[in-house]
Amino acid sequence: MPIRIPDQLPARKTLETEGVVVMDQSRSARQDIRPLQFGLLNLMPNKQRTETQFARLIASTPLQIDLTLVRVADPLSKSTPEDYLQNFYSTWEDVRAKKFDGFVVTGAPIANMPFEDVRYWPEMLEIMDWTQTNVHHTMFICWGAQAALHHLHGVKRYRMEHKAFGVYRHKVLDTRHPFLRGFSDDLAVPVSRYNDIDRQSLSPDLDILIDSDEVGICMLDDRKYRAAYMLNHLEYDNTSLADEYHRDIEAGLDTPLPVNLFPGNDPSRMPENRWRSHAHLLFQNWINEIYQTTPYELEKVGTGEW
């Protein structure tokens, strides 16, 4: 079912060729149901690839969703032209008065930097607080998840001895949780991070949903702040990890082969996507839970009144 995105957004053609139903504004205006309002705060330099990955998953439900692409005031992007940002993205200041049913905060390639040294950290603090008054439920991804856990719960992170890089088996700890309905008992998840979070610093308001003996916690649910934290990358394409590997090799970096990615550990071969179905199922479940619990009157989002 449909997602509504800007008519000229390049991701539109990619999504349509994959069979994703993309709706234009004139068609959506004739429907009587209230579209769900979702925002995507895209912190990645390659905006087009990231927005396509998340739009693909957000579009996988029978619900009409209006997706607003959001960026911080600092463009962050050397690979995305300014006119592209002007045409398709709003700054957070542009949308801070709006209400959203769902909001996604992506990762960012700044894993080795203390949070407080990130140049847009003051704006991130405002955004994370703003989700409590203007968003019904938020999903934080990778660095975004670590940042939110640090700010909202004081969760500590630490640098691992070796980068977790590849596709790892994970255990589902609560198959009855609304976000994990239909999940198998274990799943393959793409991982690319240097840091992990300290379990001992988790607050009682946080429930671990997906975990791994090899690379640590994958996903948590936050009952207090209406949020989910996905520390890894179910949204990734087949080639996301492979592209990262080849990029680093070409740059002369000593990069290990991604674990369990290439068939026969041959980096010339196309990786197989073994996580796609769980990625779609996670977003279907998450969006359905939002649909079931969000106020019909959008202005009541974040007020606790409906």
Swiss-Prot record:
EC numbers on record: 2.3.1.46
Catalytic reactions of this protein: L-homoserine + succinyl-CoA = O-succinyl-L-homoserine + CoA
Gene Ontology cellular component terms for the protein in this record: cytoplasm
Biological process (GO), any one: L-methionine biosynthetic process from homoserine via O-succinyl-L-homoserine and cystathionine
Keywords: Acyltransferase, Amino-acid biosynthesis, Cytoplasm, Methionine biosynthesis, Transferase
Site (Important for substrate specificity): S192
Family designation: Belongs to the MetA family.
Protein's name according to its UniProt entry: Homoserine O-succinyltransferase
Annotated source species: Pelagibacterium halotolerans (strain DSM 22347 / JCM 15775 / CGMCC 1.7692 / B2)
Lineage: Bacteria, Pseudomonadati, Pseudomonadota, Alphaproteobacteria, Hyphomicrobiales
